[in-house]
Each structure stands twice: as structure tokens, then as C-alpha cells.
Amino acid sequence: MSFSTINSNVNKTTGDSNNNTTENSSTADLLGMDLLQSGPRLMNTMQPNNSSDMLHINNKTNNVQQPAGNTNISSANAGAKAPANEFVRKLFRILENNEYPDIVTWTENGKSFVVLDTGKFTTHILPNHFKHSNFASFVRQLNKYDFHKVKRSPEERQRCKYGEQSWEFQHPEFRVHYGKGLDNIKRKIPAQRKVLLDESQKALLHFNSEGTNPNNPSGSLLNESTTELLLSNTVSKDAFGNLRRRVDKLQKELDMSKMESYATKVELQKLNSKYNTVIESLITFKTINENLLNNFNTLCSTLANNGIEVPIFGDNGNRNPTGNTNPATTTAIQSNNNTNNASPATSTVSLQLPNLPDQNSLTPNAQNNTVTLRKGFHVLLVEDDAVSIQLCSKFLRKYGCTVQVVSDGLSAISTLEKYRYDLVLMDIVMPNLDGATATSIVRSFDNETPIIAMTGNIMNQDLITYLQHGMNDILAKPFTRDDLHSILIRYLKDRIPLCEQQLPPRNSSPQTHSNTNTANSNPNTINEQSLAMLPQDNPSTTTPVTPGASISSAQHVQQGQQEQQHQIFHAQQQQQHHNAIANARSDVAIPNLEHEINTVPHSSMGSTPQLPQSTLQENQLS
């Protein structure tokens, strides 16, 4: 709509009127009322297209014929109002149709409406009826149409029948069953725009008072100045459309930025949670390391209190110069076997602590693989797991050892009371009696036989307990074939199998001779009493035969004689300790009981309490 259209309408309205001077004021009033009432619309549409329109406006303004005294037309035009915004009408229809009574409804007096559940209102109503993504945007839109939230005190919110979380809004023209009041609800005008309209209204009033007076010679000048003022405060429709599109684009970008900001906030919270978890893990790891260090210090203190010196390694310049050739540094301390000592049973204890190897030095497993183990060692395997028995027996036979198997601690004690072995592999967790308690009882009558613990519990406190019960070393489960070979090399490489050790001479003292069977003077003769004390054949006990080797009949005879000597020697040794064992049997049920039995330590036994260093490799024992 332009000024030419307005003037043409004015001419049409006044075309049938007389040229009465009183009509000038009525026409001016009519024009002023229309401009005042439709000011916002005029400012959007009053931009002329070219200079010819401007001249047309000025000419029409100067040639207006003022009708005489028909004021009803003015009042009729003043009563026409633009339709209300669709936003308000949608909200009114929802409330009138009562489509969501559990979410939004009229109040009892009908002068306001209340949102009962903002969450359901956001998820059910906004996506289907409005262009708002959240409830806050909907509230801002209500404020633009001069809706106000009804404020309540905390006490009133608690007593409110609609709930404490309800939102109540009101507008003087927005009431139940009052549809005609919607035309009076319009968007609020911004402050800057109000100022411009005030200037336009002043100009129009001045135009009504001065510009339409025919006696005023400066009327045309006032008309021109008023038109210029109005046009300077308006924009073209195209410019307004471009501005509106830019605003919509900015609004979309703002919404996208909000969504991205929310997603970034969520990711930041996740990262913060992960960071806190990592910090807690590091703190826990630090605590565990401190506990391990304290336990290690306790272990070193315990070893020092028991007379075992722990070497202290300095820097690279103060290390043992032979560290490149020796894989371990051995510190041996032998206590005096004094009967007046508080501890009745003493033995030789040696501690092997690994030295830091040089880059060119061989690993312990590689060095152990180069050492050949003598054949003929007799090993007692105390294990209750069938798979471990099968695999361990297979490895022991491969290394030339004979194996006897028992499945619990009590059987191990009974077997060690009757027979002697070069080495004992003792499991810890077994039925009837555990391995640690069984070892402490065995040490009451046998301090010579090396006993190796086979266990998966390798905590520092457990290792200290095993060593205190008399075990020499620990073979940590799961272990490999090389780990088992390393243990055998460590304890048997410098020993002579019991079956090959020399028997007591024939011309011994009468007392010794009386305790020795006369048939033992001939190594090739086996006494029936000695055979009765020999261990029965076990399915797991076999004589090792090297694969691929050709054994003649003479070798078979010689091997049988060596086995007979081994068995006779076992019988003789156990006969000598029979009386001491009988006294210790009464204390079998009491673990860690000290007995006054002094046994001469074996000179060739290298008892080495050492922490397990096995590595999980192929052929593991579970």
C-alpha cells in the first residue's frame, strides 16, 4: 500500500461531496486516524517505487477535496482491525477444544490458562502446533504478545491445586469463550520503533492542524515535509523481507549453536568423568605400589632377622664386576649347629638374588638350557590336579628323573617318613592337609630334602609364609617347561643322585653294623627286609630311557643293579631315622612345632629361597 492508494481512496470517499470548507477538517481527521491506527503497516508498505510516485503523492495531497461533515465514515474505518497473530489463535483453539486437559487448560475463573506439565507440553504440544523447540522459547513468545506469568509465593505454590510446577499466564483480552478479544492481542512494539511512531504521530497531528487549512499558505510545504518524514522512517517491502530472512537464518544458526553447545557440554562431562576415573586409578595404583614397597621392605627385614644378608646394589660403577658372567649373586650364611641354641634345627640357607644382567649376557633360562642334568634323581610330586600331574611327570621323565606321585599333604608326610627323595615338588592347596603345613611337619624330621612350593599365590605375605614353613623355593603357577628345568638345575646340578651315593663300608663299628642289614654288604644282593621297606611301584614311577638310544643287555643289568642299590640305600637311611620319626609322629597334628631333633645339614644342598621369575609361555601348566 502506497500514498497514491491512500489518496485515491480519499478522493473516492469525497468524490460525491460538496466543496464545503467544513469537509476539509473531516478529511484531514479521517486521514490522520487511518495513519495513526495502521501506522505499523504503513511503515512497511509506504515506500514509493520511484520519483514519479513522489510527485503523484504531492499532487494528490494538494488536490484533496474535503467532504462535509460525515463523521460516521471515520468511525467505521477506525473500527476495522487487522487479524491477530496465528500463534495466539492456535493456543486459543487448543484451550477451547480441550485437546490436552492433562497438560494445559483454563483456570476456574476463565481469565487465565495454566500449563500443568511443562515436560509433556514440550514433547506433545510444541512439536505438533508451534514452531518452538523448548518451553522457554514458548514463554518468550507469550511475552511478546503481552502475556504475563501469574506470580505466586512459596506458600501459594504449595497450596495450588494445579501443582507446584505449574505455570499460569494471563492477558486481559485472552479469556475463555471470548474469541473476539483475540483481535485486540498484538505484538508489543519495540522501544526504538515506538519513538519513530511518536515522531510520525506528531507530524500527522501537525498535518491535521496546519497542513489542511486552506487559509495557511505554507500548507503544501508542510505536506511535503510530513511525507518526507514518513518516508524516511519506513523501509521497502523487499528490504523488510530480506531483513526477515536474515533474522530467520540467524535464529536457525543460533538454535544450531545451542544444540552444538549442549552436545559439547555432554562430551565435556564425559571427558571429565573419564579424567576423574583415570585420576582415581592412578591414586589407587600409587597406593598399591606403596603397599608393595612396604611389603618388600618387610620381606627384606624378615630375611635380615633370620640371618640372611640382602646385598645392596649401588650405581653402575659399584656393581659386582663379575655380573656379566654370573647370572646371580649368592650369599650363603651357615649357622652353627649348637645344641644350646634356642632353635633346635639349623640348616644351611643360601639366598640367590639376581644381578642386573648386561645386554650381552645370556638370560637365566638360556644358561639353564645349556646345563645338562644328571639322570637318576628321584622326585616326589605332591599334586591333586590330574592335568598338572600328567604334564609335570612328563617333563620330569624327559629330564631323566623318576617320579612318585601323592595327592595330599598327609600322604606326603607318610611317604617322606618312609623313603628319601632328591627333590619334592609340593602343591599348596590340597585336600586333607595343605602343602605349607605338611612342609613344616616334614622339617621336624627332615631338613635335607629340598621342597619346592607350586602355587599361584605369589603375594609377598604368602611367599614369606611359605619360606617360614620350611620351603626352599617357589615355582609359580602357571609355569613352563623351562621354569621347571631351571628349578631342577638350581637344586640338583651339584648333587649326586641318592641311588649313586656310596653305601657305608662293611667294616663299620658294631653299633652301626647292628643297625645295618648284613645283606647290604654285597651291592648286588637284596635283603627281604630291605625290600619290604622299599616304595611300591607307582604307575607314575618309571625309569627314564633316552629316546633313540640303543641299550644292550649288559646296560640293562647295570641299570637294574643301580636301581636296587638306590632302593637298599633308601631302606638303610630310613631305618636309622625310624626312632626319631616315631617321636615326631605324635606332633603331626600341630603345625610349626619345634622338635629337638638335630639333623646334620647336607653339604651339597643349595637351598635358595627366591621369588618366582617364571614367564607365561607356551606349554603352560594351569
Curated annotation (Swiss-Prot):
SUPFAM superfamilies: CheY-like, Winged helix' DNA-binding domain. Residues 1-29, 501-579, 599-622 are annotated as: Disordered. Transcription factor that is part of a SLN1-YPD1-SKN7 two-component regulatory system, which controls gene expression in response to changes in the osmolarity of the extracellular environment. Under low osmotic conditions, phosphorylated and activated by the phosphorelay intermediate protein YPD1. Also activated in response to oxidative stress, independent on the two-component regulatory system. Regulates heat shock genes in response to oxidative stress and genes involved in cell wall integrity in response to osmotic changes. Keywords: Coiled coil, DNA-binding, Nucleus, Phosphoprotein, Transcription, Transcription regulation, Two-component regulatory system. The phosphorelay mechanism involves the sequential transfer of a phosphate group from 'His-576' (H1) to 'Asp-1144' (D1) of SLN1, then to 'His-64' (H2) of YPD1 and finally to Asp-427 (D2) of SKN7. Gene3D superfamilies: 3.40.50.2300, Winged helix-like DNA-binding domain superfamily/Winged helix DNA-binding domain (1.10.10.10). Present with 2570 molecules/cell in log phase SD medium. Pfam families: HSF_DNA-bind, Response_reg. Residues 378-492 form the Response regulatory domain. PROSITE patterns: HSF_DOMAIN, RESPONSE_REGULATORY. Belongs to the SKN7 family. This is Transcription factor SKN7. Residues 84-190 are annotated as: DNA-binding domain. It is found in: Nucleus. Its main location: nucleus. GO terms for cellular component: cytosol; nucleus. GO terms for biological process: cellular response to oxidative stress; regulation of cell size; regulation of endoplasmic reticulum unfolded protein response; regulation of transcription by RNA polymerase II; response to singlet oxygen; transcription elongation by RNA polymerase II.
